[in-house]
């Protein structure tokens, strides 16, 4: 998940079958989801050099709970180094990856880096994992870009390596993609703290994996075509989010109550005229209506008071308690100033 992945052009609205009834609030989420304290994350990739520590402190002072960093082969902050720098510069801000491209590292290396950041930060780190999707980055680095099924298969095996290593347990994985055998504590020094695992994306198999093993299910609201040249708004409206949460729920079974639901808000617009701003966004997207934009849980429009009310209502409706917004990037202003004011209203 990254600022340049957001749906600003070449988008296709997903078609929903007329006879498909979205899950109701009562059956989709539980009181555990609707009663959790709201958490807020800021997602940044902008290189700031020696000013990064100052920036991390400003994020903490603004009331955010988490500073997350993406994992793309572009001129941006690298995820583990950035997370470590942010943790060292702050006192209670959590850091994390949103999300690591599993194909860029061996899972043993991912576990080693994760354990180190978690130990240094005193447990203020959450590990977000994904299957990778930007074909252009694979091509530029000379990496083979395989099918989505293969990439998710590889992520599943990777998780089966990473989790026991971080827990200080022996690992014995002999799969199609990884073969790792080690005694407890042999390859990775366990950090001695629980590291929340976030599995993020929009695809069904990814979210099923989140339901089975993750502490946090990260919901993006959209997907890409095979080479990531088009964004498909398949689950960008209320019915779509409910559908994706239902996938997590069905895979989770009895552990669903314990899973934190996270959503990545793609656009934050401070405005006194929500309808006009929705029309502007719809025109920028192309092929969707202002009503579709207003219905999207992944868009936040209005005054700061309206935004605060909307987030409270969305937690009631969807059970999402952890909301992430974007920092500045090329062509995009940071959502931090507006969301800082929203956070102040909610706390």
Predicted features, each with a name:
Residues 1-2, 28:
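Accessible peptide chain termini
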Residues 2-8:
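Cationic, amphipathic, low-complexity segments that mediate targeting or membrane/lipid association
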Residues 12-14, 19-347:
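Active-site-adjacent structural elements that line small-molecule/cofactor binding pockets in enzymes
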């Amino acid at each position: 998940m990254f600022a340049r992945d957001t749906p600003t052009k070449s988008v296709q609205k997903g078609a929903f079958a007329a006879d498909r009834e979205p899950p109701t609030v009562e059956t989709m989420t539980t009181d555990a989801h609707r009663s959790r304290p709201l958490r807020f994350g800021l997602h940044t990739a902008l290189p700031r050099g020696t000013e990064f520590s100052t920036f991390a402190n400003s994020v903490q002072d603004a009331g955010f709970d988490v500073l997350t960093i993406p994992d793309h082969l572009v001129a941006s902050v690298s995820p583990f180094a950035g997370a470590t720098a942010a943790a060292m510069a702050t006192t209670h801000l959590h850091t994390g990856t949103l999300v690591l491209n599993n194909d860029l590292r061996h899972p043993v290396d991912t576990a080693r880096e994760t354990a180190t950041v978690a130990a240094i930060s005193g447990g203020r780190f959450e590990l977000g994992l994904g299957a990778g999707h930007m074909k252009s980055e694979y091509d530029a680095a000379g990496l083979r870009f395989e099918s989505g099924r293969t990439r998710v298969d590889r992520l599943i095996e990777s998780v089966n390596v990473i989790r026991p290593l971080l827990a200080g347990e022996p690992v014995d994985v002999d799969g199609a993609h990884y073969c790792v055998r080690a005694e407890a504590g042999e390859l990775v020094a366990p950090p001695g703290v629980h590291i929340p695992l976030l599995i993020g994306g929009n695809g069904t198999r990814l979210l099923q994996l989140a339901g089975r093993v993750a502490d946090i299910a990260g919901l993006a609201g959209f997907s890409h075509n095979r080479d990531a040249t088009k964004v498909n708004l398949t689950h960008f409206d209320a019915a779509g989010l409910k559908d994706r949460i239902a996938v997590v729920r069905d895979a989770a079974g009895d552990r669903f109550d314990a899973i934190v639901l996270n959503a990545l808000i793609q656009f934050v617009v401070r405005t006194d005229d929500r309808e006009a701003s929705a029309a502007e966004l719809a025109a920028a997207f192309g092929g969707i209506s202002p009503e579709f934009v207003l219905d999207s849980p992944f868009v936040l429009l209005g005054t700061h008071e309206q935004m605060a009310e909307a987030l409270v209502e969305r937690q009631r409706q969807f059970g999402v308690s952890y909301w992430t917004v974007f920092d500045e990037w090329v062509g995009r202003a940071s959502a931090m100033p507006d969301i800082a004011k929203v956070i102040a209203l909610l706390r």
